[in-house]
Amino acid sequence: MTESFEIFDVVIVGGGPSGATAATDLALLGSKVCLLDRAGRIKPCGGAIPPKLIEEFAIPDSLLVARVNSARMISPSQTAVDMPIEGGFVGMVDREHFDEWLRQRAQAAGADLRLGTFERVTRAADGTAIVHYRPAANASRESTSPTSRQMRARAIIGADGAMSAVAKQCIAGADRIRYVAAYHEIVRVPSGATQQFAATRCDVYYQGRLSPDFYAWVFPHGDTASVGVGSAHKGFSLRRAVEELRKLSDLAGVETIRR
């Protein structure tokens, strides 16, 4: 007896902004789409979206937690340059709520949203991809079912991040792609502007002590702010860099909401 599988035109692994948006667009075009998203940490991200992208991707005002109208660039020599933002402002979003809204939009467009963890891809005799995954045990995604499931896909989109498990299985050399690791903390901001922090300004630091090869950021989110750094150097302490960054930006003593 031949085992039967659900067949999708496209299976998208990863329900972040790229995966969820692809699911929405493909579903609206009439494709049968499955969006597979797993439980996991919220990725470190400043959450900035330029006005042109807010319009192009129809992001509602209700998702914007702040509007930033300037950016400050701090050089290795401590020179700070303030620049106005083209288009008037950059919208700031909280990725925890923004990503979930994008997934719900994809589902409303007709995509089949499934909670679970991607395991592997195999091929049927006719070459069709078989996606193996482990469903979440409950809606809170706190654990996965012990039983693996399968579905067929005419195409697979690996939107599961820089260290994509899909890419590693399907694309030669994907495991050697360089990537930047990032770490951020969401903190409560002071009630008013301080000497180094302003609620309507993004700060970007290009300083070796904060990141030897990337940059550090302080992005306001209304009552909170994302304070983070990135680096490709595996021996570099991102947590210590964020601790230093909080001191520099007058955010050392405020409440830490999320790490």
Give the ranges of each region predicted by the language model.
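Oxyanion-binding "anion nests"
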Residues: 258-259
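Beta1/beta-strand and adjacent pyrophosphate-binding region of the FAD-binding site
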Residues: 2-16
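Predominantly flavin-linked oxidoreductase catalytic cores and closely associated redox partners
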Residues: 29, 105-255
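N-terminal Rossmann-fold NAD(P) dinucleotide-binding loop
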Residues: 19-20
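Short amphipathic alpha-helical segments
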Residues: 23-25, 47-48, 168-171
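Cofactor-binding loop segments of dinucleotide-utilizing enzymes, especially the Rossmann-like FAD-
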Residues: 15, 38, 232
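A conserved beta-strand/loop capping segment in the N-terminal third of enzymes
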Residues: 52-105, 115-116, 123
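Glycine-rich FAD pyrophosphate-binding loop
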Residues: 11, 24-45
